[in-house]
Amino acid sequence: MDKLIITGGHRLDGEIRISGAKNAALPILAATLLADTPVTVCNLPHLHDITTMIELFGRMGVQPVIDEKLSVEMDASSIKTLVAPYELVKTMRASILVLGPMLARFGEAEVALPGGCAIGSRPVDLHIRGLEALGAQIEMDGGYIKARAPAGGLRGGHFFFDIVSVTGTENIMMAAALASGRTVLENAAREPEVVDLANFLIGMGAQIKGAGTDTVVIEGVKRLGGGRYSVMPDRIETGTYLVAAVATRGRVKLKDTDPTILEAVLLKLEEAGAQIDTGNNWISLDMKGNRPKAVNVRTAPYPAFPTDMQAQFISMNAVAEGTGTVIETVFENRFMHVYEMNRMGARILVEGNTAIVTGVPCLKGAPVMATDLRASASLVIAGLVAEGDTLIDRIYHIDRGYECIEEKLQLLGAKIRRIPG
């Protein structure tokens, strides 16, 4: 199993490009199943979850054509089976996203209950109830979700999400695109990745209004055609490198990103003392060698502060001036990295859904273990600011969400290398 070794104490300085967003790419890949002609998806990140999704399609008979830049042409007309098997689904929660498109396009689907990061209870109930609102008949059997559309196909309906769900909104929006009649989704997720999926569907001929608000209206169409689409930049990868620069008192410029989808994070980084400049597709940040100031954050669904950034801010606060609190309202069990960071000399107290972080002058390198995707990133940041060497084990979590993380950090001057397992 690969490990990362980081020699801390070096300010980040330089420029890198940001990859396509995994959390936009996965639903967009799933949505290619809705098209009856080939679709090309560009700007895909080189990540394990992406290759797993492409492998899943291959197992189902869809033969992807991949070029050297990881643009993928998908043609769902060659599909041979409507079963998403457990051995692929178990490693990736997002595979649930094929349920809605398969059901809408082919009238049936069989998808194993998903895996992915073990963060709290992430139920699939909303997906099931939402699809039932469109007329689907669904049963759970042997660890599989087995779904059938009624005779004549799915029909438009009204569905209220009692909990905001990004993948739930995406799954039902995709299914509704080919349902007959109008579907109204209330308390829908507003994340930019949902908007990116809607724009992709609209490009194929779907009729969707309100994406990015809490009410999405879909007028079903009879068919969706192919096309070419470039996935949006990854806002969480963007935020992670910005926080790493702040924690190391450095200076970076990030290209091929979008500052408008990261406003809550940028405001907090300015509060921490960063000087930030932005353009249409770039962000520059300069700490001018200063120690960051501790900030308070509270996670909530978009457009508020993202849960996927709280672990990184805990790392920044750990070496900041003062005390900052981080309140997690989206997922439970999302402070598992704190105990590893305390072993590095951090002063972090967890009380329920709140982490109270008192900054220390510096952390000490230590062997640590990654527990989930974003926690892994926080340990990398901790390693960058620590004295001595930090060895991070179980970095397959990092590889699920960050493309070439050690190479990008090396471009910024970090002393980091991968040790093959």
From Swiss-Prot:
<comment type="similarity">
    <text>Belongs to the EPSP synthase family. MurA subfamily.</text>
</comment>
<keyword id="KW-0670">Pyruvate</keyword>
<keyword id="KW-0573">Peptidoglycan synthesis</keyword>
<dbReference type="InterPro" id="IPR005750">
    <property type="entry name" value="UDP_GlcNAc_COvinyl_MurA"/>
</dbReference>
<protein>
    <recommendedName>
        <fullName>UDP-N-acetylglucosamine 1-carboxyvinyltransferase</fullName>
        <ecNumber>2.5.1.7</ecNumber>
    </recommendedName>
</protein>
<feature type="binding site">
    <location>
        <begin position="122"/>
        <end position="126"/>
    </location>
    <ligand>
        <name>UDP-N-acetyl-alpha-D-glucosamine</name>
    </ligand>
</feature>
<dbReference type="GO" id="GO:0009252">
    <property type="term" value="P:peptidoglycan biosynthetic process"/>
</dbReference>
<keyword id="KW-0961">Cell wall biogenesis/degradation</keyword>
<dbReference type="Pfam" id="PF00275">
    <property type="entry name" value="EPSP_synthase"/>
</dbReference>
<comment type="pathway">
    <text>Cell wall biogenesis; peptidoglycan biosynthesis.</text>
</comment>
<dbReference type="InterPro" id="IPR013792">
    <property type="entry name" value="RNA3'P_cycl/enolpyr_Trfase_a/b"/>
</dbReference>
<keyword id="KW-0132">Cell division</keyword>
<dbReference type="GO" id="GO:0071555">
    <property type="term" value="P:cell wall organization"/>
</dbReference>
<feature type="modified residue" description="2-(S-cysteinyl)pyruvic acid O-phosphothioketal">
    <location>
        <position position="117"/>
    </location>
</feature>
<feature type="binding site">
    <location>
        <begin position="22"/>
        <end position="23"/>
    </location>
    <ligand>
        <name>phosphoenolpyruvate</name>
    </ligand>
</feature>
<comment type="function">
    <text>Cell wall formation. Adds enolpyruvyl to UDP-N-acetylglucosamine.</text>
</comment>
<dbReference type="GO" id="GO:0008360">
    <property type="term" value="P:regulation of cell shape"/>
</dbReference>
<feature type="active site" description="Proton donor">
    <location>
        <position position="117"/>
    </location>
</feature>
<keyword id="KW-0131">Cell cycle</keyword>
<feature type="binding site">
    <location>
        <position position="330"/>
    </location>
    <ligand>
        <name>UDP-N-acetyl-alpha-D-glucosamine</name>
    </ligand>
</feature>
<dbReference type="InterPro" id="IPR001986">
    <property type="entry name" value="Enolpyruvate_Tfrase_dom"/>
</dbReference>
<dbReference type="GO" id="GO:0019277">
    <property type="term" value="P:UDP-N-acetylgalactosamine biosynthetic process"/>
</dbReference>
<dbReference type="GO" id="GO:0005737">
    <property type="term" value="C:cytoplasm"/>
</dbReference>
<dbReference type="GO" id="GO:0051301">
    <property type="term" value="P:cell division"/>
</dbReference>
<feature type="binding site">
    <location>
        <position position="93"/>
    </location>
    <ligand>
        <name>UDP-N-acetyl-alpha-D-glucosamine</name>
    </ligand>
</feature>
<keyword id="KW-0963">Cytoplasm</keyword>
<dbReference type="InterPro" id="IPR050068">
    <property type="entry name" value="MurA_subfamily"/>
</dbReference>
<feature type="binding site">
    <location>
        <position position="308"/>
    </location>
    <ligand>
        <name>UDP-N-acetyl-alpha-D-glucosamine</name>
    </ligand>
</feature>
<dbReference type="InterPro" id="IPR036968">
    <property type="entry name" value="Enolpyruvate_Tfrase_sf"/>
</dbReference>
<keyword id="KW-0808">Transferase</keyword>
<dbReference type="GO" id="GO:0008760">
    <property type="term" value="F:UDP-N-acetylglucosamine 1-carboxyvinyltransferase activity"/>
</dbReference>
<keyword id="KW-0133">Cell shape</keyword>
